[in-house]
């Protein structure tokens, strides 16, 4: 099976988000925190006008999410500590021969395990979402964030050295190991093209 990550501009069925959690990088004042919640709500609302949205919401935030989000946004209750879904969520891939959907489960450690970050709950979101949509889980040995990779859907992948080669993320990584890990998760098609 060969997986291909479609370009970000390719049609897709749904946008996955995570709702903010009180006390996690939303601001030092009540006013700033409310602005943060309002911004997340505005994004979810704008996207939902064109594309279905599902949003993971921590049990402690369900009442607020139901009050703030429009009814067309699907609320999925799940433990959340980090809410930058692009970084800790799955990377969806497709097997073009069978049409099967896969979800790469990168290892997420809160951007290199800084003292301030809380990510243990959200590190499991890739598998939770894969299960919810019936995608095959594509495991990875690479500590990565989804925002650290970009593809064109035709075999080109751009990586961010400050992510993949960061010793706080991938202690023993060098270019060859990162390229092998990316080839293992089959982000390029065919996998023998230069990365």
Language-model regions, residue ranges each:
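Hydrophobic alpha-helical segments and helix pairs
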Residues: 159-160, 179
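A short secondary-structure junction signal
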Residues: 115-116, 160-163, 167-173
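Internal alpha/beta scaffold segment
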Residues: 176-183
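N-terminal basic/disordered segments at the start of proteins
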Residues: 1-16
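Conserved small/polar residues in nucleotide/adenosyl-binding loops
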Residues: 185-191
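Beta-propeller domains
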Residues: 46, 52-53
């Amino acid at each position: 099976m060969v997986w291909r990550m479609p370009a970000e501009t390719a049609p897709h069925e749904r946008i996955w988000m995570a709702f903010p959690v009180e006390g996690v990088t939303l601001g030092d004042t009540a006013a700033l925190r409310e602005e943060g919640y309002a911004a997340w709500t505005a994004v979810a609302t704008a996207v939902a006008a064109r594309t279905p949205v599902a949003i993971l919401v921590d049990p402690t935030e369900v009442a607020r999410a139901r009050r703030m989000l429009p009814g067309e946004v699907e609320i999925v209750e799940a433990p959340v500590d980090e809410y930058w879904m692009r970084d800790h969520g799955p990377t969806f891939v497709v097997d073009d021969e069978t049409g099967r959907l896969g979800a790469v489960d990168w290892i997420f450690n809160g951007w290199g395990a800084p003292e301030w970050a809380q990510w243990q709950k959200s590190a499991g979101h890739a598998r939770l979402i894969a299960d919810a949509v019936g995608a095959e889980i594509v495991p990875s040995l690479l500590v990565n964030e989804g925002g650290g990779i970009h593809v064109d859907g035709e075999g080109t992948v751009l990586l961010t050295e400050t992510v993949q080669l960061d010793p706080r993320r991938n202690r023993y990584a060098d270019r060859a190991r990162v390229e092998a890990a990316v080839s293992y998760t089959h982000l390029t098609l065919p996998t023998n093209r230069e990365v």
